[in-house]
């Protein structure tokens, strides 16, 4: 039987897309290959959010050139956001690539594979990407107890730095009944935790008119075998009081919020087109904490946006000190072709951006370690997810607040909920001891 190998770059939505592609290929008779060198088809699911993500793909394509020389029958395909952005340019730069599929076009994979003859190159990408769903029963999930579930595609916000709306299209919500059918099916297959995905997940239902994310969470909460529900990514401007109340009053909905701040300076937030001020963002955090005291928060911060000055950077630093996020994803600004910010000329020298980045990273290290220290001695319910690759005697899993915990346990407990006593604080994780298995 022919073998496939998929390499995934980027966000959780890309991970979900790769699971769909794996399911499509297995439906065609392919089996997964543990080693890239032994595969008959290699697919790269790509990301264009930052230049560095694209550079990783270029490096991998250079590596695959050598593999193709050794095996002329090897098929190499590229899909995802980078494929949507570059289209034919990828074939021109890397002639050993056989096909390029833009956003959502991986659904055409069966036809593409049938049409390839070893000489013909295929590029399939729409100017305006339009989502196409895959039968959820054929999706090859990464594991048997957790599942990604896209509920809304695209984004309407058009932040000045972001290329995603151009590559993923406008917002399009999935039918709520179809989503519920998918969750019910997954529950019947043993899934206990679902994560609802969207580039802007709390915009769900705006284009449908009669449902929103809060309504959907309530419906999924009614499904008995589902024990945990997560959702991401949220735009701060779209978090409603209704959504906060639903998270507060429905115990299966994890009280973890991913709310990208991007900057603590109102001037830079305006330039980014984020649609809120720092004081409005902070008020939202305070409102959530007042209603959900155990809520945790992660965020994204862009360092060195064009025109950023020292006082803007210091405002962002103060924001991190005031809010004390549980996780901060820091990124140095990366110019993306076709976005309004790509035309801004007041660029920041790399040395300045790196200094600011290092300063924020060091600050966040202190904050997260202090937060982790405060967990020592407490008991947490953890879903055991996988064997620790650095220590086969340990498993790792996450709390409802998305804190990573390592603990000694047999691998047979993977997929189970465990009561774990936290015994040690580490920089990015916690260490614990299993007390017992729990039935939620």
UniProtKB/Swiss-Prot annotation:
Cofactor(s) the record lists: [4Fe-4S] cluster
EC identifiers of the protein: 2.8.4.3
UniProt entry keywords in alphabetical sequence: 4Fe-4S, Cytoplasm, Iron, Iron-sulfur, Metal-binding, S-adenosyl-L-methionine, Transferase, tRNA processing
Cell compartments where the protein resides: Cytoplasm
GO CC term, one of those recorded: cytosol
Disulfides per UniProt: none
Reaction catalysed by this enzyme: N(6)-dimethylallyladenosine(37) in tRNA + (sulfur carrier)-SH + AH2 + 2 S-adenosyl-L-methionine = 2-methylsulfanyl-N(6)-dimethylallyladenosine(37) in tRNA + (sulfur carrier)-H + 5'-deoxyadenosine + L-methionine + A + S-adenosyl-L-homocysteine + 2 H(+)
Residues binding [4Fe-4S] cluster 2: 155, 159, 162
S-adenosyl-L-methionine among keywords: yes
InterPro entries membership: Elp3/MiaA/NifB-like_rSAM (IPR006638), Methylthiotransferase (IPR005839), Methylthiotransferase_CS (IPR020612), Methylthiotransferase_N (IPR013848), Methylthiotransferase_N_sf (IPR038135), MiaB_methiolase (IPR006463), rSAM (IPR007197), rSAM_horseshoe (IPR023404)
Similarity comment: family membership: Belongs to the methylthiotransferase family. MiaB subfamily.
Assembly notes: Monomer.
Name of the protein this chain belongs to: tRNA-2-methylthio-N(6)-dimethylallyladenosine synthase
UniProt organism field: Dictyoglomus thermophilum (strain ATCC 35947 / DSM 3960 / H-6-12)
């Amino acid at each position: 039987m022919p073998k496939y190998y998929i390499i995934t770059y980027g966000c959780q939505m890309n991970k979900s897309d790769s699971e769909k592609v794996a399911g499509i290929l297995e439906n065609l008779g392919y089996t997964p290959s543990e080693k890239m060198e032994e595969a008959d088809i290699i697919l790269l699911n790509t990301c264009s959010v930052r230049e560095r993500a694209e550079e990783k793909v270029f490096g991998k394509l250079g590596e695959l050139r050598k593999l193709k020389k050794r095996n002329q029958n090897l098929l190499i395909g590229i899909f995802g956001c980078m494929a949507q952005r570059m289209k034919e340019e990828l074939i021109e730069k890397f002639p050993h690539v056989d096909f390029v599929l833009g956003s959502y076009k991986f659904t055409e994979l069966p036809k593409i594979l049938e049409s390839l003859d070893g000489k013909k190159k295929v590029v399939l990408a729409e100017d305006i990407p339009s989502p196409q769903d895959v039968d959820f029963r054929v999706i090859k999930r990464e594991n048997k107890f957790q599942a990604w579930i896209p509920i809304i595609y695209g984004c309407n916000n058009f932040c000045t730095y972001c290329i995603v709306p151009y590559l993923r299209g406008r917002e399009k919500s999935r039918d709520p009944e179809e989503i519920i059918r998918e969750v019910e099916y997954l529950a019947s297959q043993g899934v206990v935790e679902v994560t609802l995905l969207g580039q802007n997940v709390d915009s769900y239902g705006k284009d449908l008119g009669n449902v929103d994310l809060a309504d959907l969470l309530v419906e999924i909460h009614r499904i008995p075998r589902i024990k945990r529900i997560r959702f991401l990514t949220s735009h701060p401007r779209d978090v409603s009081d209704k959504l906060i109340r639903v998270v507060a009053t429905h115990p299966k909905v994890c009280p973890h919020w991913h709310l990208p701040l991007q900057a603590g300076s109102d001037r830079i937030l305006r330039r980014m087109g984020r649609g809120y001020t720092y004081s409005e963002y902070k008020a939202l955090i305070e409102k959530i904490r007042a209603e959900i005291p155990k809520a945790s928060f992660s965020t994204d911060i862009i360092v060195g946006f064009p025109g950023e000055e020292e006082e803007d950077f210091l405002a962002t630093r103060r924001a991190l000190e005031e809010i004390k996020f549980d996780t901060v994803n820091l990124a140095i600004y990366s110019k993306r072709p076709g976005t309004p910010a790509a035309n801004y000329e007041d660029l920041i020298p790399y040395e300045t951006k790196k200094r600011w980045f290092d300063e924020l990273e060091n600050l966040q290290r202190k904050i997260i370690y202090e937060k982790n220290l405060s967990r020592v001695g407490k008991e947490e319910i953890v879903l055991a997810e996988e064997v620790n690759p650095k220590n086969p005697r340990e498993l790792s899993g996450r709390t409802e607040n998305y804190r990573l915990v390592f603990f000694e346990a047999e691998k047979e407990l993977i997929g189970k909920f465990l009561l774990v006593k936290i015994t040690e604080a580490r920089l990015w994780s916690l260490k614990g001891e299993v007390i017992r298995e729990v039935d939620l």
